[in-house]
Curated annotation (Swiss-Prot):
GO biological process, one term: photorespiration
Name of the featured protein: Ribulose bisphosphate carboxylase large chain
Catalytic activities: 2 (2R)-3-phosphoglycerate + 2 H(+) = D-ribulose 1,5-bisphosphate + CO2 + H2O; D-ribulose 1,5-bisphosphate + O2 = 2-phosphoglycolate + (2R)-3-phosphoglycerate + 2 H(+)
Keyword Cytoplasm among UniProt keywords: no
CDD domains in UniProt: RuBisCO_large_I
Pfam families reported for this sequence: RuBisCO_large, RuBisCO_large_N
Post-translational modifications reported in the UniProt record: The disulfide bond which can form in the large chain dimeric partners within the hexadecamer appears to be associated with oxidative stress and protein turnover.
Entry-annotated residues carrying N6-carboxylysine: 197
The protein's Enzyme Commission number: 4.1.1.39
Amino acid sequence: MAQATKSGFNAGVQDYRLTYYTPDYTPKDTDLLACFRMTPQPGVPPEEAGAAVAAESSTGTWTTVWTDNLTDLDRYKGRCYDIEPVPNEDNQYFCFIAYPLDLFEEGSVTNVLTSLVGNVFGFKALRALRLEDIRFPVALIKTFQGPPHGITVERDKLNKYGRPLLGCTIKPKLGLSAKNYGRAVYECLRGGLDFTKDDENINSQPFMRWRDRFLFVQEAIEKAQAETNEVKGHYLNVTAGTCEEMMKRAEFAKEIGTPIVMHDFLTGGFTANTTLAKFCRDNGILLHIHRAMHAVIDRQKNHGIHFRVLAKCLRLSGGDHLHSGTVVGKLEGERGITMGFVDLMREDYVEEDRSRGIFFTQDYASMPGTMPVASGGIHVWHMPALVEIFGDDSCLQFGGGTLGHPWGNAPGATANRVALEACIQARNEGRNLAREGNDVIREACKWSPELAAACELWKEITFEFEAMDTL
């Protein structure tokens, strides 16, 4: 209960909704907007819970403090301006909050997330809380560099147009020596792939130190380029235990002429990622981003952060590629939801579309796009669906789907390249890949023994599990 004091303010505890629940508020163009899915504790009204989220993620604390008189809370407080029941869910609500622009440091994803997903997620009045979406205002967007280069510049660097890019994660992910690792890279690139990739947990272990890997891989890239007359690359993972070590590895990659490096942006952190992205832009290096740890954060429907938020934040922090799921492979991803955040990664302007989980219209103010990477449990039979779903501005990455070929790495790469080229030709001729995709692959098998062997090996492989990431 609040009470007046000699210092001229009402001390004590008062309901959050008295200050932070403002249903008559109309958000400004400069406000950062957030949509939370909240599950209040029994007995807590949704208006009080929504106001508590607004307070604890902006200017509020658990009690009135006299220093409130030293600032203009009306200018700086977050405002819960709308609450909607979540369809088909008991005691769950979408809570919409507007935050004034001045609450956030320019060009800092770290600062935005510290406010929005900080202490409030441990708040006792809430049983669960999930950040579903953010609308970054253009005024804030313009303070971020974004992707080092973006999709259009990457295409020009590679001189590859009119089709998705093809990649492969080198397997086994751990245990190879640097020389054998470089051999696998060469065979895959020579067989027809555009890129190969370090797995997310390859850093600098006793069996393969980073410098040795970088040198053998660069030798493989240059040899494959000379023999195919195509630009090739390998995502050298520069993620390290410290930012200083990460930048040392990135600098060495630049010195040996590698075209692209890689970072694990969630385990490495947004501050490290933004630092690396700025370096990559300054030095003409592409930046591939892996999302290791994302499912810990985004897989539960009622608590955490949705991946569309992480994807938006990564685009602002900086990344030319980002893993996005496959829809058809072994990793989580329902089609409508996945394509919603894929559009948020690569399009300049995305309209609100609740059917795809997009709660706000987002204008990126001409910021370059991030290319989605489809990776995880995919093989040649998936190629028509992947081309139809993701389109040209994507990277299709086959790890086991390349290296698991019965004839070896290079034939596995050739099988994937033939399947891709066949699908692109069929699409350009007006054929419907969703309906005729398997026929397209079978026809291509007649003139590619490598593809025929791959199709025979993986004809029975499916990953039929219900997607958890649904509306």
